[in-house]
Amino acid sequence: MDIIFYHPTFDTQWWIEALRKAIPQARVRAWKSGDNDSADYALVWHPPVEMLAGRDLKAVFALGAGVDSILSKLQAHPEMLNPSVPLFRLEDTGMGEQMQEYAVSQVLHWFRRFDDYRIQQNSSHWQPLPEYHREDFTIGILGAGVLGSKVAQSLQTWRFPLRCWSRTRKSWPGVQSFAGREELSAFLSQCRVLINLLPNTPETVGIINQQLLEKLPDGAYLLNLARGVHVVEDDLLAALDSGKVKGAMLDVFNREPLPPESPLWQHPRVTITPHVAAITRPAEAVEYISRTIAQLEKGEKVCGQVDRARGY
């Protein structure tokens, strides 16, 4: 069994050694331009077209939860990967736990009004504020995949009213499910906090725009943990300036790194992190990949395969 590996920023040598240890029967090598030798599996992130084109692979693993970059490259270069080759993504591998930590900490930050107290502190102003009531602090999760379900589970502990919206209806205990475009407005109408965990598809690009934000309750909060292209940044800034949206926590952006001239940096109601809400944990990723390859070799059914038509 031959495995080729490519990631522009990861510690390639660590990965190769870890994969060799986890899959002793495999010959693992770092792919370099001009390497056309045979391979059974490819582990990639932003791979060059020539790495995959023309190969008779058993499967390709994207080294992250999102596959939008490789799918967009496939649209431009369909010869890059045979349609019959299964494409897998890292559904969790520690990302769910990280998303839970990020989402819960920020929801509690807003619920306890720490954002308001920070603004008061900036002007040396001492004033206790009325508390928010949990029953009025409905949290809506936009996108109900693996990571969305993990975030919902963690928030249930805090007894917030929860709802989710997705392409198809979900049956999560204690979570009100909305499905399809026809139910989006009803979903948004009660969301005091909107957490975006949508996949990046042509249908979801720009979905968080003026029209969507207007359907939220006044003084709502936005937490974007998915992709920057989901948010029309000018529309969000306008909603923040008007007070329609009271605060935003943004981990992802249309351009990354976020340009220094972006008004988001200095907005008093925006908090920024540099795309770190959930990063790939190498040891857990290697365990998932080695387990999945073993299942594929045995002809077993496996989880995590991407539906290329849907984009996730």
Swiss-Prot record:
GO cellular component: cytosol
Subcellular location field: Cytoplasm
Domain of life: Bacteria
Stored Pfam families: 2-Hacid_dh_C
Transmembrane segment boundaries: none
Keywords for the protein's UniProt record, in alphabetical order: Cytoplasm, NAD, NADP, Oxidoreductase
Function: Catalyzes the NADPH-dependent reduction of glyoxylate and hydroxypyruvate into glycolate and glycerate, respectively.
UniProt similarity note: Belongs to the D-isomer specific 2-hydroxyacid dehydrogenase family. GhrA subfamily.
HAMAP family listed in its UniProt record: 2_Hacid_dh_C_GhrA
Protein name: Glyoxylate/hydroxypyruvate reductase A
Lineage, top ranks: Bacteria, Pseudomonadati, Pseudomonadota, Gammaproteobacteria, Enterobacterales
